[in-house]
Amino acid sequence: MQQHTIHIAGGVARNPLVRLSNPVTLDFLDGEHIAIVGSNGAGKSLLVDLLTGKYPLRDGTLVYDFRPSATQTAYDNIKYIAFRDTYGSADANYYYQQRWNAHDQEDAPLVCDLLGEVKDESLRQQLFELFRIEPMLGKKVILLSSGELRKFQLTKTLLTDPRVLIMDNPFIGLDAATRELLYTVLEKLAQLASLQIVLVLSMLDDIPSFITLL
């Protein structure tokens, strides 16, 4: 029997202000890489919030199976990155970009400081090689290019060894060359045996070739 990493059946949020028009029934099967595609305001973010357990359900069931992970909590196994601005940064990186500017770059943290200590040395080596992080370690985060910021944040997130990685609009604000680079990086990520990738996209043209389910 195939493993269902995320299974929601007839899901309706308890909070009436954050309900979709219809109950949600959806299965994420192990080995699938999924794209959730829709226009702005279509409810993509709310769907992700339901799948990750952010909103308790009034009706329906939500079941996780994150094997071979040592824990079965959504907090440990599902990581979400929202790329919101032209720098390609999400919550944490956006904070750093706004906090430090050209007048106080000396106080801005280095990439190596923000990545911190790593418990799994094998995973660290694999990710550093995949994203070519070594040349970036001595750089200040505020000075990273949009492509470098994407790679930094993916590395920082993946060092937590999630089972499911959800990325919201990962291609927003990128030029053509950087988009192609990110396509290549994500395709390599999709080959990691224990990682399931979910992309939240606004346009069908952004769907990479490794996506197996829409």
Regions found by a protein language model. Give the residues of each.
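ABC ATPase nucleotide-binding domain signature region
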Residues: 48-118
